[in-house]
Amino acid sequence: VFFLEPEVPGSSPDLVYSASDLVVAASCEYQLLRKLDEKLGRSPKPDFGVDEMLEHAAKLGDVHEHRVLAEFVEEFGPWDPATGRGVYDVAPADSMDRATLAAKHAESIEALRAGADVVFQAAFFDGQFHGRSDFLVRQPDGSYAVFDTKLARHIKVTALLQLAAYGDQLLKAGITPDPSVTLVLGATVPLPGGGFDYLRSHHNLPDILPVFLERRERFLTLTSAHMGQPNTAQWGSPGLTACGRCDYCQEMVKATDDLLLVARMNSAQRKALHERKIFTVKELAEAHLPGANSALLRLQDQARMQSGVGASDGEVRYVKDGEEHIIRFAVLPENALAELPSPCEGDIFFDFEGDPLWQEGATGVWGLEYLFGVIEAPARPGVPGVFRPFWAHSREAEKQAFLDFLDYVEQRRQKYPDMHVYHYAAYEKTALRKLSVMHVAGEDTVDRWLREGLLVDLYQTVRNSIRISENSYSIKKLEPLYMGTNLRSGDVKDAGASVVAYAQYCEARDSDQPEEAARILAGISDYNEYDCLSTLELRNWLLDLARERGIGPGTGAAVVPAELPASADLAEADADLGPAELALAEFLEPGSGLPDADRQAVAILAAAVSYHRRERKAFWWAHFDRCENGPDARHPQDRNVFLVEEAVALEDWWRDGTKLPERRVKLIGTVTAGSDLREGSIWFRMYEPPLRAGLAGTGINGTGRNGWFGTEVLELGEEDGRDTVII
């Protein structure tokens, strides 16, 4: 938003808004009004620092936009004033005054009326709205279709508001918009002759225009009312939406001791607590909660730790950014420390570094796992463990690093059959699965690792065993408890910084700056090595906590791999690939000699042949993840999940003839957003330990959750603001 001199002398300045402002308002009205207060001079602009990851993504977004521009220029040619055809580029306004904006609007409309094939960055200004449309593309019937580029690989509803905004501006200018509007996403699709194109998502303008008009009306009402009174935007004002995640919200979350500070608190739980007149962490810590379910009691326990009123088993004082901090911890009475495997001298501690914004030039496929880092368990006390990095700076190198890593682990398992691979959180497991599917290699090996419990996620142990006084359970928050004075330092301090650093490395390498490239890469390596070391020390600290409480590590049978492949060539280990898949995979090897176009055709065929197997595998991977992670993990964000808070038996067990016994139960809880829960649909019901008779846990040594398929939804409803399901 910005203000222009009033058209009517002596009146207040006119507010001008953009499509981006409507997107902000749709996501967070509080942020919108805070920014409006800054423009009104009611409050200073806060210094939230530079988000290098956001800046990096914005640069890549510009590159994406100009690639699409180049495609249009190649198709239609540059603007030719003599014919009125080609791609017309509207240069940005050199100033933001009313006359200049009106002139740019007139220039854009003139290019459209002249019949330009494409108008790039068409400027619109109607006195209230100002915006620049990425592309307006002429259709055979003379109408213009709105195209917008988004680096995102998936559609966001807010992006459709921008398309509708420019469609509305065309209507106001008397130019017919095509009924189909298009998002050119960052996701790519292979072309039959080789290369790739960006995925285009088409939408119906008449369907989204009413939503845009409603959001615009809300925006104008909100801003008009705010400017009509003298106060700044107030956090928590009734009727004012707030996302809770942006910098403006986070500032107030901390300032007001908001419930969102509680680790693992979600918006639905916060809303339920507000209904109990509980608004702060302190109030939750001190509240009396009659009838509270186990999830709410866990949150209260966490709030007590963060408020300093909960009982603790220890604390650590440390200095960060020149200030002293204290972190406290408590071991839960019912914990998962016994599930930790017995230490083995062959254990390794694993961490990936990946760049989701790296894009392969030939195929357009996003994402590169460029470093597989491992620290081996120290051979003896006082001797540091060996750090082994597996680097990859291309897609082919990524496959080789993946296979080398699998081979390294398999050979190590031959020597140390009781070993485990420790990591923190789900990224490593997810990345290994993704790599096995992408490269059509090592799938059976990765599956076998998962079945045999080789991978040990210490995050699951932490969240089921201890409480800490921090509002996050990231490994970086835990490190003061066990890393002593060896706390993080260096230029690369978190995953976002490592992504930016890797992009800088690529730039230095490609611009012939080998010394700078080597310096950046060394910083990334140090960061990854510290992550691996931190995972090792966390495992040791958890074992110490268990030992202090007389808890021995897991006593289940050692994980002995069945029929380990004797060959180091792990392509032979893909027992779950069919003959056709294996044959096609051979054609895709770098030394196959196939021309690029033929390789592309073989790749498409290979993907089609293995489609159903991959889809089945993805289903079961997701299923066992849910069984392993439980309801405190990502379920509140997952679709097609009903989180049960209460259950009431409506009919006891009964049998109809020879059918299996059944009963009717009413479940009360929350249906996650976007779920397709319908009467007559069949679902899986999952139980937490202790499990019912006949069920075995899906985790290591038979621990974890499990349940049964075949649960039919009979009726859906709502009760006191909560969802109900009769099954």
Protein language model annotation of sequence segments:
Residues 186, 195-256, 267, 276, ...:
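Acidic, Mg2+-coordinating catalytic module of metal-dependent nucleases/exonucleases
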Residues 111, 115-137, 142-224, 376, ...:
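Conserved DEDDh/DEDDy metal-dependent 3′-5′ exonuclease domain
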Residues 2, 20-21, 25, 206-317, ...:
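Cys/His-rich finger/ribbon microdomains and the adjacent scaffold used
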Residues 270, 275-364, 600, 613-639:
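Long, highly charged low-complexity segments
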Residues 27, 36, 42-88, 553-692:
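Accessory interdomain/linker segments of ATP-dependent helicases and helicase-like nucleic-acid enzymes
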Residues 693-719:
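Short beta-strand-centered aromatic/proline hotspots
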Residues 110-112, 124-125, 317-418, 436-441:
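Conserved RNase H-like, two-metal-ion catalytic cores of nucleic-acid enzymes
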Residues 1-139:
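Metal-dependent nuclease catalytic cores that hydrolyze phosphodiester bonds in DNA/RNA
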